[in-house]
Amino acid sequence: MEKKNITLTILLTNLFIAFLGIGLVIPVTPTIMNELHLSGTAVGYMVACFAITQLIVSPIAGRWVDRFGRKIMIVIGLLFFSVSEFLFGIGKTVEMLFISRMLGGISAAFIMPGVTAFIADITTIKTRPKALGYMSAAISTGFIIGPGIGGFLAEVHSRLPFFFAAAFALLAAILSILTLREPERNPENQEIKGQKTGFKRIFAPMYFIAFLIILISSFGLASFESLFALFVDHKFGFTASDIAIMITGGAIVGAITQVVLFDRFTRWFGEIHLIRYSLILSTSLVFLLTTVHSYVAILLVTVTVFVGFDLMRPAVTTYLSKIAGNEQGFAGGMNSMFTSIGNVFGPIIGGMLFDIDVNYPFYFATVTLAIGIALTIAWKAPAHLKAST
């Protein structure tokens, strides 16, 4: 057990380093866009090409995680990310930036299924929620710390954060090669008999509703998260520091919740009920954000709504990991794919609605998240999962 805890610590440290690199470039990306005189449409397509590439590659990467191993896929993903950030740092043309973002999408498609499958192999059904909560917290913490460091580095040179991000990813890849050993497949992740083969597995009853909820919730969450900064800027006149305080505050509270409460909540409620309650919380608060006006009220609602998001995401990942048996890579790849679909189309639809009325993207998010709540009411855990808990 101690050996597995050390392995988990190494894995989460490498994941933190990778997402620290992602966070580094957040403050300086608009500066690069202004330097190259890119339009809002070009930036939107650039964001979409990351998600589309991740969408296309995720199913393949998921299969490869099961076929070739967890460690090699994580390392490949980190190397792709390192190259992606380096190219963005040296990029002087739109074409180079698009290539960079596409490589970034490939890296995400490899890393996340590999990490979740790795964790499934070194944990038991009972200890997995805590480990996946730690995984989400490591990602959140990287996003929290990264922008602050990136803003400091950008004072030296606007391209420096991208080179540091590339170096961090390369460091994480080297550490993974040197310190991680390919895990033995967990005997608890038994083969589930009688399931559909190939992509027909998407429509298997134990997966289908989970994937639908991932898709629908990703639509709602992406439309909310991608336009939150514009919303509070246009509606309330918030400054960049105000927005940073709210997002950082939400991320900190969310990370603490994932570490301290997520494991307890999954034991008390189970994943399906926790997903439902998180969706109810998020749906209510996204709508409430369109009605509040005071700074303190907006701050409290924003911080709390991110807690709902940060509980739902690892709950879905934990549920999929528990039901997937020996198909951990497949489940992780599909999770990534359906999330990517939402990340592609949610911001596009939200952006169109924002041009009509600043509140409309949040109404749209409220409706889509409410559909997710309705789906959870009909959602039942498969028999083999009930038997194991």
Swiss-Prot record:
Species for this entry: Bacillus subtilis (strain 168)
Organism superkingdom: Bacteria
Membrane-topology annotation of the record: Multi-pass membrane protein
Record GO terms (molecular function): transmembrane transporter activity
Gene3D superfamilies linked to this entry: MFS general substrate transporter like domains (1.20.1250.20)
Record bears the keyword Zinc-finger: no
InterPro entries: MFS, MFS_dom, MFS_trans_sf, Sugar_transporter_CS, Tet-R_TetA/multi-R_MdtG-like
Record function comment: Energy-dependent efflux pump responsible for decreased drug accumulation in multi-drug-resistant cells. Probably uses a transmembrane proton gradient as the energy source. Causes the efflux of a variety of toxic substances, including such structurally diverse compounds as ethidium bromide, rhodamine and acridine dyes, tetraphenylphosphonium, puromycin, chloramphenicol, doxorubicin, and fluoroquinolone antibiotics.
Transmembrane segments: 6-26, 42-62, 71-91, 102-122, 134-154, 160-180, 202-222, 243-263, 286-306, 336-356, 358-378
Protein name per UniProt: Multidrug resistance protein 1
A GO BP entry: response to antibiotic
GO cellular component: plasma membrane
Subcellular localization: Cell membrane
